[in-house]
Amino acid sequence: MTIDLSSMITETRNPASVEIDQLPTLEMLRVINQEDQQVALAVSQLLPEITRAVDAIAAAFGKGGRLVYIGAGTSGRLGILDASECPPTYGVSAEQVVGLIAGGHKAILQAVENAEDDAELGAQDLKNIQFCANDVLVGIAASGRTPYVLGAMAHARAVGATVCSISCNPGSPLAQAADISMVAVVGPEIVTGSSRMKAGTAQKLILNMLSTGAMIRTGKVYGNLMVDVEATNAKLVERQKRIVMEATDCERAVAERALAQADNHCKTAIVMILAGLTADEARTRLQSSNGFISQCTH
């Protein structure tokens, strides 16, 4: 089967870099940097679509649903990267934000031949995690045509879930198959077709906003503090103390005592201090407010 790449912006040559192999290193890097500066501007054009996606994800979380990223190659790895950071940062289970990649775990470290061309595999990978109508799927593919991702999106639509897409070529099959389509038009890559570069950077920026925005909307952030952070290493133990001190304007000893009484749960310690409650009382109040600290202290 012949694939026509001529209409894909991500596959065209970039006039700014046609002689990049002849440039001194500093000039070469300057060209790359100048092109990278276009990425955030391209993503800024998508804020209305990203808003819709964030609100859909937050609503799914409220119903016990999950956020599932799916992609092949770099796109799949970026989804896994974003998903893997959610449990330590926001204290959610590893099942709440899931990243799937064509070819499975082996494909995280090395290419798996032909995996991205299997549409049925994409659907099967969703079936394997019991993907359902309460979940949200985000299909990621710079080209906008990856069969593995399209197969997953078709299955997600069939079960009644909200389907989003992140791509970099306007009018692609991926964009057309989504309820919410986020198309970051970043232009041709510095190295023709190397969509791990500008396209990958755009995907990462959007993924950052999707997960962060949904976590903020569901009470995982107080002010700009990650109040559900888990103390899984020495740095994060210290961060917890600083968060409690910042959130309550208390002394270090007060924060340490509250955290000890709260079994090292930041939110509980903060509510204890702000509302003058015991640990059990703070937990009860947090539960009744769906985890929103701001609703516990008024």
Curated annotation (Swiss-Prot):
The keyword Lyase applies. It comes from the Bacteria. It catalyses: N-acetyl-D-muramate 6-phosphate + H2O = N-acetyl-D-glucosamine 6-phosphate + (R)-lactate. It is an enzyme of class 4 (lyase). Gene3D superfamilies: 1.10.8.1080, Glucose-6-phosphate isomerase like protein, domain 1. Residues 57-220 form the SIS domain. Transmembrane segments: none annotated. One of its GO terms (biological process) is 1,6-anhydro-N-acetyl-beta-muramic acid catabolic process. Pathway: Amino-sugar metabolism; 1,6-anhydro-N-acetylmuramate degradation; Amino-sugar metabolism; N-acetylmuramate degradation; Cell wall biogenesis; peptidoglycan recycling. The active site is at 85 (proton donor), 116. SUPFAM superfamilies: SIS domain. Its EC number is 4.2.1.126. Keywords: Carbohydrate metabolism, Lyase. GO terms for molecular function: carbohydrate derivative binding; carbon-oxygen lyase activity; ether hydrolase activity. It holds the Pfam family GKRP_SIS_N. Belongs to the GCKR-like family. MurNAc-6-P etherase subfamily. Specifically catalyzes the cleavage of the D-lactyl ether substituent of MurNAc 6-phosphate, producing GlcNAc 6-phosphate and D-lactate. Together with AnmK, is also required for the utilization of anhydro-N-acetylmuramic acid (anhMurNAc) either imported from the medium or derived from its own cell wall murein, and thus plays a role in cell wall recycling. A lyase-type mechanism (elimination/hydration) is suggested for the cleavage of the lactyl ether bond of MurNAc 6-phosphate, with the formation of an alpha,beta-unsaturated aldehyde intermediate with (E)-stereochemistry, followed by the syn addition of water to give product. Homodimer. This is N-acetylmuramic acid 6-phosphate etherase.
